[in-house]
Amino acid sequence: MPYIFYDTETSGLETAFDQILQFAAIKTDDDLNEVDNFNVRVRLLPHVVPSPQALLVNRVAPKLLTDQTLPTHYEAICEIRNKLLEWSPAIVIGYNSIGFDEELLRQAFFQTLHPAYLTNTEGNKRSDVLPMVYATCAYEPNTLSVPINEKGNPSFRLDQIAPANGYNFINAHEAMADVRATIYMA
């Protein structure tokens, strides 16, 4: 069964109120070789006020949010849905995706009147690399290098753990770059 690795960049952290600003995905074969990829940026909905912190983290200029050449939210979500259906059935997987990206994706499908549970229906299954990293560190503690953050705690953030394990991470918090780092960590 192929894999669909994906990531979103969003207008904030509130899954019920914020929106996807960028969605990227890579379909791989069983050996994690890239078969196809998809990347779309999304125009900001008129009623969504983006978090300044999210814009700083994602390095999105406010001007880009209203760029009329970008697809509308509805158009982009339709493109995402069509691509996921085209690639199905597959294992849909991200990094820290079950509790965040997955919820935003479901909310976006719901808001655009599409079935919300695409990632675990239509023959699809879902997973998350972050719990796999936790399990690897717990059961094989010398397998991965885990960086220590400024508070002296282990950091499992993708933008920190991937480089600590040899990944040349350029452009963290850009959805396609994060997808490639997730595949590396898988």
Label for each model-derived stretch:
Residues N58-I77:
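Metal-dependent phosphoesterase signature
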Residues D18-F23, K27-V60, K83-A186:
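Metal-dependent phosphoesterase core characteristic of DEDDh/y 3'-5' exonuclease domains
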Residues M1-I4:
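Extreme N-terminal starter segment of soluble prokaryotic enzymes
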Residues Y6-E9, A25:
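N-terminal phosphate-binding or glycine-rich loops at protein starts, especially the Walker A/P-loop
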Residues E9-A16:
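Short acidic, Gly/Ser-rich segments with clustered Asp/Glu that frequently serve as metal-coordination loops
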Residues H73-W87:
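Short, basic/hydrophobic alpha-helical segments
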